[in-house]
Amino acid sequence: MLDYLRDAAEIYRRSFAVIRAEADLARFPADVARVVVRLIHTCGQVDVAEHVAYTDDVVARAGAALAAGAPVLCDSSMVAAGITTSRLPADNQIVSLVADPRATELAARRQTTRSAAGVELCAERLPGAVLAIGNAPTALFRLLELVDEGAPPPAAVLGGPVGFVGSAQAKEELIERPRGMSYLVVRGRRGGSAMAAAAVNAIASDRE
């Protein structure tokens, strides 16, 4: 029999201990540091900490929104699948409309992506919601456009889209002009569905 650690709780404990020992978390307040640890745990890269941009109130604001029952709006089915429902404090609805037939029709009409169309279809649910965006820069760009057009902003944007085209630019637009939204995103090309879901999971419950 191979010799390896089998206890899930101990694997988690040791993993988080290694992350806290190796990552530079000094610039983060304690609540944000806990989220960053989760992001690192998801991707295995401690230098992610160097690229996290955030507003000081993001954990408190997103946490309060979730506690009040706000929905979690996701840009992809993968983000939605990664959110641990048992961690959500108020049986919060997890919404992803990327696979909705209406998104396909709207995307064709707008000549954009289904992810962007899915965000637009969620416009009425935006006020006070938590947005988990990990896949599509176009989804974040469309969110920013909707707020510019008068839609009430969500409480927070978490994660950040991954990619080589538009990803860094969409996040920088959010950072430079937050439009009343709190945020925690990974700058540059990195991001992804797993990171977006991890950010929600970390904020949804104090359990590490």
From Swiss-Prot:
<feature type="active site" description="Proton donor/acceptor">
    <location>
        <position position="41"/>
    </location>
</feature>
<dbReference type="InterPro" id="IPR003722">
    <property type="entry name" value="Cbl_synth_CobH/CbiC"/>
</dbReference>
<dbReference type="GO" id="GO:0009236">
    <property type="term" value="P:cobalamin biosynthetic process"/>
</dbReference>
<comment type="function">
    <text>Catalyzes the conversion of precorrin-8X to hydrogenobyrinate.</text>
</comment>
<dbReference type="InterPro" id="IPR036588">
    <property type="entry name" value="CobH/CbiC_sf"/>
</dbReference>
<dbReference type="Pfam" id="PF02570">
    <property type="entry name" value="CbiC"/>
</dbReference>
<comment type="pathway">
    <text>Cofactor biosynthesis; adenosylcobalamin biosynthesis; cob(II)yrinate a,c-diamide from precorrin-2 (aerobic route): step 8/10.</text>
</comment>
<protein>
    <recommendedName>
        <fullName>Precorrin-8X methylmutase</fullName>
        <ecNumber>5.4.99.61</ecNumber>
    </recommendedName>
</protein>
<feature type="binding site">
    <location>
        <position position="15"/>
    </location>
    <ligand>
        <name>substrate</name>
    </ligand>
</feature>
<dbReference type="GO" id="GO:0016993">
    <property type="term" value="F:precorrin-8X methylmutase activity"/>
</dbReference>
<comment type="similarity">
    <text>Belongs to the CobH/CbiC family.</text>
</comment>
<feature type="binding site">
    <location>
        <position position="38"/>
    </location>
    <ligand>
        <name>substrate</name>
    </ligand>
</feature>
<keyword id="KW-0413">Isomerase</keyword>
<keyword id="KW-0169">Cobalamin biosynthesis</keyword>
